[in-house]
Amino acid sequence: MHEYIIQGGFPVNGTIKASGNKNAALPCIAAAILSEEPIILKNIPEIEDVFVMLQVFEALGGHYEKIEKNVFKLQIEKVKTSKIPEDLATKIRASILFAGPLLARTGKAVLPPPGGDVIGRRRLDTHFLALTELGARVETDQNFSFIAHKLMGEDIFLDEASVTATENAIMAASLAEGTTIISNAASEPHVQELCKMLNKMGAKISGVGSNILTIEGVKKLNGTEHRIGPDYMEIGSFIGLAAVTRGQLKITDVEPRDMRPLRVAFGKLGIGWSLEGTTLTVPDKQKMQVNCDLGGMIPKIDDAPWPGFPPDLTSIMTVIATQVEGTVLIHEKMFESRMFFVDKLIGMGARITLCDPHRAVISGPSSLHGSELVSPDVRAGMAMVIAACCARGESIIRNVYQIERGYEHLVERLKSIGVKIELKEK
């Protein structure tokens, strides 16, 4: 077990490169099941979740090798089993992403209930709906078993714009017979990334970036090389870190289009940045002040499917709001347990009223003090790191495995921009 020891109160300064998008890397790894040929993935973040997905890929009969930093070669000439090992499935929710590819390649997929962050009720019904529409039969006992003699294209309307259910449907439909239309599809950048990779492999997917996808099934998918785009969730986290520590930070390898929803939400808290090409600069000593809605109403920051504000950043925004002059409502619509970490911020000196499991009213600025904290999930854990960096004194954060599931070489990279952080073995 490891823990972070952070001395707060120091501004960040310098340049940091954005890592590859974790939420794009995971489905792209699963999609390698769809071809017998080699897949080379570049800009893959070297984080816990990626390595667990690679272990699942290997357990199914695949082989992978690290060619160089952040570049991996994957190949699975023959699938030796269609069952995900239970010990790996329980480590990561994204193991569900192997259902569609296994079903398309072998006609069967057996998955133990997936693990991952405990941030509320995370239903799997939309996955079942999509795959059964394509011709699969679902059996449930201790595991979820998907069986299909032949997948057939279908007109599918998803009951929610689930990212992973959309990705499963896309992968299964790519090798199905006939044409599939997916309505109410998720359109997040990582879904677009998967579609781009599959099209390079020979898939025929149109409507990429919209909520209606058309997929013409093909008989075979080929190998390819694909570079994963930058992680806008990580970029948003670093913007927040710079703002609350009053430092100047340059973030390189940014995709400007991904930043538009973030600019709107951060702007409500008086936080801005400049973009020059793919380099984003957060200026120091910004006047962080809540911009009230018309009529002087308290502004609301709420999450929504893309191109709305991403739910993975609501924890980060909650911490930022504690350092902004004024009052704001944070409304986490999607996950009812994500806001429960705010009691730790209150213990550090934040003024927060938790209205219900989905909503919190934050008034600032508050002077935070160091504390002992336990990371409940990857995003709340990073929010705690940001809180510790702007707090007075020393903070200790435990269960940092959760944070390192989503943030690459975090301690090393934070040190490079001036954060007083140490990794200690407990």
UniProtKB/Swiss-Prot annotation:
The active site is at D117 (proton donor). InterPro entries: Enolpyruvate_Tfrase_dom, Enolpyruvate_Tfrase_sf, MurA_subfamily, RNA3'P_cycl/enolpyr_Trfase_a/b, UDP_GlcNAc_COvinyl_MurA. It catalyses: phosphoenolpyruvate + UDP-N-acetyl-alpha-D-glucosamine = UDP-N-acetyl-3-O-(1-carboxyvinyl)-alpha-D-glucosamine + phosphate. It is found in: Cytoplasm. Keywords: Cell cycle, Cell division, Cell shape, Cell wall biogenesis/degradation, Cytoplasm, Peptidoglycan synthesis, Transferase. The keyword Manganese does not apply. One of its GO terms (biological process) is cell division. It comes from the Bacteria. The keyword Methyltransferase does not apply. One of its GO terms (molecular function) is UDP-N-acetylglucosamine 1-carboxyvinyltransferase activity. Pathway: Cell wall biogenesis; peptidoglycan biosynthesis. Its EC number is 2.5.1.7. It holds the Pfam family EPSP_synthase. One of its GO terms (cellular component) is cytoplasm. UDP-N-acetyl-alpha-D-glucosamine binds at R93, D312, M334. Coiled coil: none annotated. Transmembrane segments: none annotated. Phosphoenolpyruvate binds at K22, N23. Cell wall formation. Adds enolpyruvyl to UDP-N-acetylglucosamine. Belongs to the EPSP synthase family. MurA subfamily. This is UDP-N-acetylglucosamine 1-carboxyvinyltransferase. It comes from Treponema denticola (strain ATCC 35405 / DSM 14222 / CIP 103919 / JCM 8153 / KCTC 15104).
